[in-house]
Amino acid sequence: MRISLNWLRELVQVDLEPEVLAEKLTLAGFEVEEIEDRRTWAAGVVVGRVLEREQHPNADRLSVCQVEIGQAEPVTIVCGASNVRADIWVAVATLGSYLPCIDLKLKPTKLRGVRSEGMICSLSELGLTKESEGIHIFPEDAGLQAGQPVGPLLGLDDVVLDLTSTANRADALSLIGIAREVRALTAATLTLPEVGTADLSRTTLSWRSLYKVKPGSHYSGTIIEGVTIAPSPEWLQKRLQLAGIRTINNVVDITNYILLEYGQPLHAFDRQKLQAIAGSSDLAIGVRSAQAGETLKTLDDQERTLAEAALVITAGDCPVALAGVMGGADSEVSQETTQLLLEAAWFEPIAVRRSARSQGLRTEASARYERGVNVTELPIATQRAIDLLLQIAGGTVISQTVATTTQTEPEHSITLRLQRINELLGPVQAEDEELKDLGADDIERLLTAIGCHLTLVDDAVWQVRVPPYRYRDLEREIDLIEEVARLYGYDNFGETLPPLGSDEGALSIDESLRRQIRAVCRGVGLTELQHYSLVKPGSDRQVHLANPLLAEYSALRLDLLSGLIDAFQYNWEQGNGPLWGFEIGRIFWREEDGFFEADRMGGILGGDPSRGRWQRGGKEQAIDWYAAKGVLEEIFERFGLTIEFQPDRQDDRFHPGRTASLWLQGDRLGRFGQLHPSLCEGRGLPAEVYAFELDLDVWLDHLDQPERQVPRFQPYSSFPASDRDLAFFVDQSVTVAELERIIRRQGGALLSEVELFDQYCGEHVPENQRSLAFRLTYRASDRTLTEAEVEPVHDQVRQSLVERFRVTLRS
């Protein structure tokens, strides 16, 4: 925002040099990006009176002028402007002056044989316009005097501060807001503009107080008749130009002036045009959401098709403006306008943001509404605009009607503790360079300076009532503490280190386990991935954002698997080969009784990640189901956990015959399997890609057990083992996991290993059965087992398989 220092000094009596003031504002969080000192643009430039003008003897396009500039004798100046003539007031750059905008230092020179002792300037040469058709000529009735500086006449006696503020400071987008800030930083006197009271005793039946106001809105309309549209007075034009706003006419310029001064967007409609649009003199103004397919031609001459997210102002239910963004071209103020409807409104920031985004249109008005306009000052800003309109454009106020549905509470109270302030901010540097804590007097002085009202409710505890113009950014105690630090000056706090206790810096058990899991996954060859939690909507179970930045990222993810598949596909299409990766993240979903979230771990792997294919004649050797399963098992073996695989067909993205649910000591852990062939074919992926998604909370619960906190070494047995092979026919519906569970249970402490080493389906095998062969290893840690010890246990295993699964023993 561009701030005129002269305008600012009318509101707050500050005599600091621009550089000093800029530094104070920057340290307080308002970064001054540029100091535009316009006083240097016209240093040495004075008002001159052209006494005579003669044709240059040696050039057709040059004139020789005698110009009075307040010196003893007129000076001779050669001028090339076509509009120079005698008896006009002009701006003259005297000898020795420097014009920074054109990088020119004036010195005596000869032009085609005639000596010139200065230069008659155009506005472009003084930096006021980009181009000029000739020299600038002052009005005859300006009461000028030869030799007086031109700076005050052209607004070149001012300094402009170009500053930016943080997004939470809605009040900083107004000159009064900056003036309040300067008052707080310098203890200067603040003087706000005087606002009169309009005579609203007259009413008119042609105005009907019928408002269809959208919840969360405040809307007032003031009818003014008998206005005269004309150029704005020079002082108003200068202030708008200094702020970087183009002048249009007196009415529009006044609304822009209030926008800069109070930060309150206003809009002036041509009332008669509104009546024509509505088709009735009985005017009904409304605020509603646009209907899909409605169109509106805005002031930038763009015909816009409105989305349902757009908020519109209506006349007779016909859209006439984008609420809080831009007015409509069909109701704009023109030279023929004599009746106005002055709109002053407060809209929900979210509603304006959606409306502006739906049209790809951001304006000075929408920028302020999006941050939050101070609704309590809306009547003051409206009356200030009415005062200026009556003063500059004439007319009579006929009526004013207000409709509101806003529930916004512009003032609220916050509990503030002195102890908490000093705990967070630490001591300050005193004048004697000793460190001391902030006192109660300091807190009251600083917060009172920004408009807060403090009531002491306990020993060094206040109830702080926040001013309405700061209700958007001062919401919690920590916000007030930040204000104390900002106003006192960050550089005035002492340099201290926080005390460290013996327990400081330790990782929580949960975080430590997560890091171990990540390290193990990297150790087995998986790369850690990270995806956005925001995804494209497509399911009723998704949690949808109330105010999304983009429609493609307007919902929260239901799982990690979708992102992992997308990442695998992207890497494959980019020629980077198969992706072996894992991700730890949070998923979200909704149910009838509310919203839920949980931590998950997912992974994906497939294809042939190996190198040295030349040894296989260039043939790929893709990882198979058992190898992928082995990667997952190795991860759990590193933590001393054994997982159980059971058939699973609940997710259509997985192969129905090569998918398993994972169980950990009776708790469902997740799912692992091969992606469905149709999914891989549709995405152009390798034929065999495997993925898993695990409930991280279940995993961490099993790891966070006292017996697992400290690793224990189990010595290897130094005694020989006794192996037994067990072969049998079994129904194909029986899983190997079920068989292994029974074998281990019956084998007891003596059974150390169970390994499936053969499977056969074919000739000589009964129908719907298969032949399986297991190798059972029996071992004791303190002795060599004898046949008498092994055989009874082994027979018990065999008998249990026959009884439980009706197997046909072959050995």
From Swiss-Prot:
One of its GO terms (biological process) is phenylalanyl-tRNA aminoacylation. Its cofactor is Mg(2+). Its EC number is 6.1.1.20. Mg(2+) binds at D473, D479, E482, E483. Keywords: Aminoacyl-tRNA synthetase, ATP-binding, Cytoplasm, Ligase, Magnesium, Metal-binding, Nucleotide-binding, Protein biosynthesis, RNA-binding, tRNA-binding. Residues 39-151 form the tRNA-binding domain. CDD domains: PheRS_beta_core, tRNA_bind_bactPheRS. InterPro entries: aa-tRNA-synth_II/BPL/LPL, B3/B4_tRNA-bd, DNA-bd_dom_put_sf, Fdx_antiC-bd, Fdx_antiC-bd_sf, NA-bd_OB-fold, Phe-tRNA-ligase_IIc_bsu, Phe-tRNA-ligase_IIc_bsu_bact. It is found in: Cytoplasm. Residues 717-810 form the FDX-ACB domain. Residues 409-495 form the B5 domain. It comes from the Bacteria. NCBIfam families: pheT_bact, YtpR. Belongs to the phenylalanyl-tRNA synthetase beta subunit family. Type 1 subfamily. This is Phenylalanine--tRNA ligase beta subunit. The gene is pheT.
